[in-house]
Curated annotation (Swiss-Prot):
Protein name, per record: DNA mismatch repair protein MutS
Domain of life: Bacteria
Species for this entry: Bacillus subtilis (strain 168)
Disulfide bonds: none
Family in the record: Belongs to the DNA mismatch repair MutS family.
Coiled coil region boundaries: none
Effect of gene knockout: Double mutS-mutL deletion strain have 40-60 times greater spontaneous mutation rate. Cells lacking this gene have a 225-fold increased spontaneous mutation frequency. A double mutS/mutL and a triple mutS/mutL/nth disruption have a 200 to 280-fold increased spontaneous mutation frequency.
Binding site for ATP: G602, P603, N604, M605, S606, G607, K608, S609
A Pfam family matched in the record: MutS_III
Annotated keywords: ATP-binding, DNA damage, DNA repair, DNA-binding, Nucleotide-binding
Amino acid sequence: MAGYTPMIQQYLKIKAEHQDAFLFFRLGDFYEMFFEDAKKASQELEITLTSRDGGAAEKIPMCGVPYHSASAYIEQLIKKGYKVAICEQTEDPKAAKGVVKREVVQLITPGTVMDGKGIHESENNFIASVSACSNGYGLALSDLTTGENLAVLIERLEDVISEIYSVGAREIVVSGSLDADTVAQLRERCGATISIEDGETDEHVTIIEHLNNEDITKTFLRLYTYLKRTQKRSLDHLQPVQVYELEEAMKIDLYSKRNLELTETIRSKNKKGSLLWLLDETKTAMGGRLLKQWIDRPLIRVNQIEERQEMVETLMSHFFEREDLRERLKEVYDLERLAGRVAFGNVNARDLIQLKESLKQVPGIKQLVASLAHDKAKERAKRIDPCGDVLELLEEALYENPPLSVKEGNLIKDGYNQKLDEYRDASRNGKDWIARLEQQEREYTGIRSLKVGFNKVFGYYIEVTKANLHLLEEGRYERKQTLTNAERYITPELKEKEALILEAENNICELEYELFTELREKVKQYIPRLQQLAKQMSELDALQCFATISENRHYTKPEFSKDEVEVIEGRHPVVEKVMDSQEYVPNNCMMGDNRQMLLITGPNMSGKSTYMRQIALISIMAQIGCFVPAKKAVLPIFDQIFTRIGAADDLISGQSTFMVEMLEAKNAIVNATKNSLILFDEIGRGTSTYDGMALAQAIIEYVHDHIGAKTLFSTHYHELTVLEDKLPQLKNVHVRAEEYNGTVVFLHQIKEGAADKSYGIHVAQLAELPGDLIARAQDILKELEHSGNKPEVPVQKPQVKEEPAQLSFFDEAEKPAETPKLSKKEKQVIDAFKSLNILDMTPLEAMNEMYKLQKKLH
């Protein structure tokens, strides 16, 4: 560093302590970056890379962003997984001797973003910490924006990854000694930034006083130490650590959460099209976050589920009160995150006005809930603390429409502070004098166009047009500025009043800022109560959300049994909404004694996967306390749900379709219990026909004989339907479809027994593959059916005399010799089909489009 200027040496010294972050180095009105930071930032932010003299032989790479717009650039970097260290000037440059003192005041990371576009209002922003323990792993979670803290002990790394995926943590704090393979899996499979923390805070941390497990304490302390080191400010809003166990809720593994599209769709990763999208009728950001948490962790205790159901039922039966509640909740801002900003010290006056406006709604909400004709509702109302003292404090202190900045005045009401009132009187009196001065000078000089003005450079002035300069008394005015058509003057008396006014205004701004910080500290004392109130409001919001969606979509209150599944006229909730005005075909599902497994056959795209997902989603909705899309629903409490549905192959990590199938099947087979729900869709499709069939049968037999879980198993292997005669708990069902005028018509009805036809080659005809190719496929199919052997290249002329072993939708006599001539309507449908961008659609959207095309043919 010897050859560099003192400022660059200062930069390098600070940068050495933050090697894993972009260092935003404050220089006047800019944050500057140098050396490799500058090169990389210019690429990531698409800003100009320049250079400057730093004292060495070669110029130093440099780029920068304006201070006032830095947050947008920081958000871009954080979104890409980077960290940003904010280095501020900590002394007045005018008073500095030598290089201005600077230090890092905050390290912003993906897991510690507090506001801005970097976080979604209805999503938590958890940061995770993972530690190796004697019996597995410790996992701690903290959301700086809301103050929530969670911790859990987990045996398997797979479950750790699943939990991190569920909460959407974008940053994971680990020890430098954690196994490298574990760290690599966390980074790659969770898509998170990995941060190392080996220090340990020496302060007394009150939010862990109640913990009695050393592994959990160690894991959370590592996370707390990291937060304290990076944020360099108060963490008073952090709530006591809530310890939970995975077994306290329904476990839904990583694969199943993706396959069932609980919170985002598989292909687009968007909320739209997911169960969360369907259910989200919440009115507050807090309620939206809680709803997602409930979907991620359905309940397994019937009494807890029924408590939610009772409140939902009560709200459904009180339409006007529910609508009033929704309107009031709409006026409640994000109390959790407002409390977090108060604690962090970055709250502004508008935030406190939002807090005030929110608190104004609480008494009405409390009274409304108390009026509901249900004992539990009245008990809930009693627990609501309106925080009236906080409301009174804010109403006394703040103007209704304060500026965004807290250092420009106009924050604090008249009458709140005597000294402030005196300063304001001085300022107002001075301005009144200035206003009178203009009239006096006009009368004295006889210049009607004379005016008194103000600017930040010269202060107050008297402006006279050049045509009237001869009317000014010599020696009375001092020229200050010459304009094209006028001159500006000052007088000793004017400067004297100006000094008094500016001093008063400066005092006002300083005192208002001081009073505002005092107000903020007073509000900080109420944070625990505000957080408790936020919890009450978010629960009410989530429950009214269930009541609203249940009534609007005609859902039914589910009942719970020990072992029986009885779903009458069940509907897939998301598909039903996507279909909108089109008629949805409901289906039954009956499982229980001597009927633990359903083997589902039927044509491709007939609705097998939809039916299976439907049962899983109905079960999840029931266990979060919502009503369900069915005429009647009786369900057991499922402890876990496992799925293998769809073609979400993990090609990026090098895993093929078949490997993904086997991994997901293994996860279910190893971890499922008799109280679990298993959905297997087309197991064995990723390998050869006989291998796939053998594995599918072996999996069915193993689940039947060794696990006994409720299982829905769809297959294209018709040969497996004979298992109904061998396995007492297995029953065949099929999706009904019929042939009409040479076209397959999906009826989407689940019926007892096995399917007897398929239509794979017909789909190829619909896709308008060449006629000779279609004809050749028919020949090959017949040859395979005749030989009963593994697929080989058969002779051209088919000789089929016996009943086909594989499913075929058309009988031999009906096989077209060539592609039939298409009608105008059929051609239009095919053109529409070809124009569909299938890769950009979710499975549900694709199914909906196919249904629309099918309707056009009839």
